[in-house]
Amino acid sequence: RTPNTSGMGKAKAVANYLNSQMAKYEAVEAGYDEALLRDDQGYIAEASGACFFIVRDGALITPPNDNTLESITQATVIELAADLGIPVLRRRISREEVYIADEAFFTGTAAEITPIRDVDARIIGCGSRGPITEQIQSAYFDLVAGKNEKYIKYLTYIN
């Protein structure tokens, strides 16, 4: 991930998408569905078009937004996790920690809540959607379907 100090990494500008699109292209060429981008110190920053979460020991862990756009979906997942009593940590994640995670998933407008099966051909957890990812995914889908009154403020109904 291109560091903020080399440009305007926190601006939602067309020029900032080139790095992500090239990473996605390289990932697809290598046989993967998505790319994980790392910051200038080698920690996971985000996916090419989504935020990244892992689950370890019952807690959600997601990188800070030091070098990425702030995400409404990421913030919503953090809020839903609090409602579900799931602890959330905002801290750096090493590539090696991803390999030993219990679960992992992407979040974003297009990704919504997408479970991750493997990273670098290493199976994450049991190799399928884990129980915490399932809880978060279910709560998120209820939210966007208007089934959770607490989050009605997030919805705009269109006739």
Briefly describe each language-model feature range:
Residues R1-N159:
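Helix-start/capping segments and mature chain N-termini
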